[in-house]
Amino acid sequence: MATDGLHENETLASLKSEAESLKGKLEEERAKLHDVELHQVAERVEALGQFVMKTRRTLKGHGNKVLCMDWCKDKRRIVSSSQDGKVIVWDSFTTNKEHAVTMPCTWVMACAYAPSGCAIACGGLDNKCSVYPLTFDKNENMAAKKKSVAMHTNYLSACSFTNSDMQILTASGDGTCALWDVESGQLLQSFHGHGADVLCLDLAPSETGNTFVSGGCDKKAMVWDMRSGQCVQAFETHESDINSVRYYPSGDAFASGSDDATCRLYDLRADREVAIYSKESIIFGASSVDFSLSGRLLFAGYNDYTINVWDVLKGSRVSILFGHENRVSTLRVSPDGTAFCSGSWDHTLRVWA
């Protein structure tokens, strides 16, 4: 028996060393492609001029920290979720609340708007993702029409509808992501590969195929093929948890925001990190990132209550936005690119333009 154990250990050790040497070879191959820096390529590009953005609307109504928000495709409505267990649908033009749902649990960490605008999904410490249809009949009880779609073995950290209302993608503290059928609640595909909690995910723009990117507490950002369930690319250059990932509008790159106080840009075709957005004066983690519609600007919300705006090509900061009175937890650019909304632990959401 003891010899069996020894053999197993030896095999394990040899497999580990083989894996390490393969990793080394991969890094060498990656390094061969590393012939020029992004800011060098962008040297001839004109610098951005004066950049002014202000808070145009403040949405008040949550009784605790705002944890997540998403825009409706109609460019007007917003769904937000909070630590108080409430999920609210807002009209961002008038600041009116159109719907409110009280979840059975607090810490609703994830919420998403369906592409049709006719439903919302949310979840958190209840380990599941619930879908609520939205109707404008004031007497209708939304909670009665709730569908429980996804079941994880730990908290739900993020959710997103695919390009239809019929499928939903979830990320969880159990270290997995999963694709579910909304109607039947059936698991269609699961994605295993993260070594710790998955904190965020983002779907590739629809033209670029069936992939999504996820980030988590293992400091890894992973790109997945939704059809096969396989990880097709992985990037491990952050020094702490990855809180947010967002695809570049063309789908050829993605940005990440991390507790290591940096945001980074990864080029999928070059298969490597191409830019780091950081300053010595920024010492707090980045909680949320999103691109402008053109992809030239990167908006990043931080735990020091600020929002930094970065020039993606030149790597420089073009603006810093003040207004929130606690950490910025979530941030999304509107579908038409005219504004963005940020949510904060100060219980409010702000629409900037």
From Swiss-Prot:
Keywords: Membrane, Repeat, Transducer, WD repeat. Belongs to the WD repeat G protein beta family. It is found in: Membrane. Component of a complex composed of RGS9 (isoform RGS9-1), GNB5 and RGS9BP; within this complex, the presence of GNB5 stabilizes both itself and RGS9 and increases RGS9 GTPase-activating protein (GAP) activity. Interacts with RGS7, forming the RGS7-GNB5 complex; within this complex, the presence of GNB5 increases RGS7 GTPase-activating protein (GAP) activity. Interacts with GPR158; promotes the GTPase activator activity of the RGS7-GNB5 complex in absence of glycine, in contrast GTPase activator activity of the RGS7-GNB5 complex is inhibited in presence of glycine. Interacts with RGS6. GO terms for molecular function: G-protein gamma-subunit binding; protein-folding chaperone binding. WD repeats lie at residues 61-100, 103-142, 151-192, 194-236, 237-276, 278-320, 323-352. This is Guanine nucleotide-binding protein subunit beta-5. GO terms for cellular component: membrane. The gene is GNB5. Pfam families: WD40_Gbeta. Enhances GTPase-activating protein (GAP) activity of regulator of G protein signaling (RGS) proteins, such as RGS7 and RGS9, hence involved in the termination of the signaling initiated by the G protein coupled receptors (GPCRs) by accelerating the GTP hydrolysis on the G-alpha subunits, thereby promoting their inactivation. Increases RGS7 GTPase-activating protein (GAP) activity, thereby regulating mood and cognition. Increases RGS9 GTPase-activating protein (GAP) activity, hence contributes to the deactivation of G protein signaling initiated by D(2) dopamine receptors. GO terms for biological process: G protein-coupled dopamine receptor signaling pathway; negative regulation of voltage-gated calcium channel activity. SUPFAM superfamilies: WD40 repeat-like. InterPro entries: G-protein_beta_WD-40_rep, Gprotein_B, Guanine_nucleotide-bd_bsu, WD40/YVTN_repeat-like_dom_sf, WD40_repeat_CS, WD40_repeat_dom_sf, WD40_rpt. Signal peptide: none annotated.
